[in-house]
Amino acid sequence: MELNGPPVSQLPQTATSTASLPVTVAGTLLRGPQLLLRAAEKYPRTPKCARCRNHGVVSALKGHKRYCRWKDCMCAKCTLIAERQRVMAAQVALRRQQAQEENEARELQLLYGTAEGLALAAANGIIPPRPAYEVFGSVCTEGGTDSKIQKFDLFPKSLIPRSVTPQLSSGGKPVSPDSESVSGSAPGASSPEARPGSGSENGDGESLLSSPISKALKEGEESPSSISPLGSESGSDAEKDEQDPSSSSSARQRTPIDILTRVFPAQKRSVLELVLQGCGGDVVQAIEQILNNRGQDKSEETWSRDGALPSIQPSVSSTHRPLIAGALTPAIGTLGSRSAFSPLQPNGAHFGTEANAYQLGGHLGLNPLRLAYSAHSRGLAFMAPYSTAGFMPTLGFRPPMDYAFSDLMRDRANVHKDQVYTNGLYGPVVNNNAEKQ
């Protein structure tokens, strides 16, 4: 009987194995969520709460920060964790800001180009300005006169003839040697407010780049001794005041003989040294002597032609100048013909735009400043702006041909009034004013 049936001990084992199978399946189905499991079992890379870990508890970080039981703990470990979190948050914020600025700069580069986009981004404060783009702000940060000098350094000097190049002032208009002599004799005579009519003296340095080209090329055909129009000669007193602060840096580095050679490039250096030595090193007086002596090189025909002035109605080509004393007097507002408040004057052609029209120094034998500031001209200046061209035809100055070079250093202010005003027009009025003073 033992050989026919299986052993009795094997029957309950199979029954127990079949009965335990559904129990294990039900156990796997009844487990909780996997986020609540310990880190040792599964998903060890899940973020955990650091404060709970300091106190021996492992908690998943998702949705746990508000409900953490140690969120207000002030122990040493929790304080260190809070400091680390603050540093990490600052680093993340900085990286986000840098990434945003780079994106905005990249968008500006796509819209405006590389250089303009970076310059625009630096101007808007998106990115800090770099040294490569400091050129855009160098002109604006300097003063007004320095900016004018810098703009004219960029001007191509090769377009200007050699005789006109040293006569360019920092104000942007060519100045003749005669106007420099007038301005040099009395540098502090008048204020810059006496020139309201001109364009470049009002401070608009942007209009300076176009004006010197036409003016310089227009006067380039004349000799270095050519005379500028009435505006640059009569207004040179105020021009000197404007030139002094702007050209002070360059004038400090030049010697007097260098200034003379720059003003008179056609003269020999030895002659200029002799004149400067005779004037005691005074550059202004040396320039005045050279300009006064230059007119005596002319022939007798030139003197007779310049002396025969029409007395009724001057033409365009005449060298007739009736209002020289009134125009040179700064007490009535220098640039009388350009002022908006002065009476109407004849046109610019009447005042002799051609060369040798206003050369007072040579053939008139009078220093323009002494004529302007003398007692006679002060009396004449109050009537000269209100007189027409035909009403006061000419000032009969006697051309002294017999004066030597050394005699020009004399003071012509003591010349008798009958010798200066030979025509007798306005003689009593002028003489009375002279006697009162």
From Swiss-Prot:
Residues 254-289 form the DMA domain. Residues 163-254, 297-317 are annotated as: Disordered. The keyword DNA repair does not apply. GO terms for biological process: regulation of DNA-templated transcription. Its main location: nucleus. Keywords: DNA-binding, Metal-binding, Nucleus, Zinc. Residues 179-201, 223-235 have a biased composition (Low complexity). GO terms for molecular function: metal ion binding; sequence-specific DNA binding. It comes from the Eukaryota. One of its GO terms (cellular component) is nucleus. Residues 49-96 bind DNA. May be involved in sexual development. This is Doublesex- and mab-3-related transcription factor A2. It comes from Xenopus tropicalis.
